[in-house]
Amino acid sequence: MSKLFYAFAVLAVHVLTSSPTTAASNLPVNLVTGPAFTTPAGAAHRRFLRSIHEGEDSLKPSAFSEERTALRAMAYLLKPKQKKLAAALKKSTSKHKLSVAPEKMKSIQVLGDPKNPEREWFKRLYNSKRGDPQTLRKLGQFKTEAQLSRYIKFYDDMLAKAKNVRVQTK
């Protein structure tokens, strides 16, 4: 049913657009864009930007020869702007290098730091029932191999501390 409706709608649009009455109804709109509308009778001729009219011009001859400007003159005008942009680009790249440094430092944090969140996480993993590094690796607890290697080092340090405590208490 809807296909039939769309077919009739397309047919109606086609008939209305091809009708000569449609073109006649648009005639007053087309008169607005005609030459009588753009240049009123008795008014002084004014030159619009890039118009091709000859005759009385309110603009000086140098102003309407904009297309004939030498490329070297344009390049000369653009040089200061290019220098400013180059300096800004140089600043932005050096600033970017400095902003990457704290991220790199986070990944190299010392595990002995008590405020290190990774150390706290490692402590929780170590105290859990499955604190073994290989078991945790199989469970997918570590995002990267570097994180796994840091946990193995932490695990070995904790085992060494536990052995020292046992030896001292005996």
From Swiss-Prot:
Signal peptide residue numbers: 1-23
Localization of this protein: Secreted; Host cytoplasm; Host nucleus
Motif RxLR-dEER per UniProt: ranges: 47-68
Keywords attached to this entry: Host cytoplasm, Host nucleus, Secreted, Signal, Virulence
Induction statement: Expression is induced during host plant infection.
Any one Gene Ontology cellular component term annotated for this protein: host cell nucleus
Role according to the record: Effector that is involved in host plant infection. Contributes to virulence during the early infection stage, by inhibiting plant defense responses induced by both PAMP-triggered immunity (PTI) and effector-triggered immunity (ETI).
Family membership noted in the UniProt record: Belongs to the RxLR effector family.
Domain description: The RxLR-dEER motif acts to carry the protein into the host cell cytoplasm through binding to cell surface phosphatidylinositol-3-phosphate.
Listed name of the protein: RxLR effector protein CRE16
Organism whose genome encodes this protein: Phytophthora infestans (strain T30-4) (Potato late blight agent)
Name of the encoding gene: CRE16
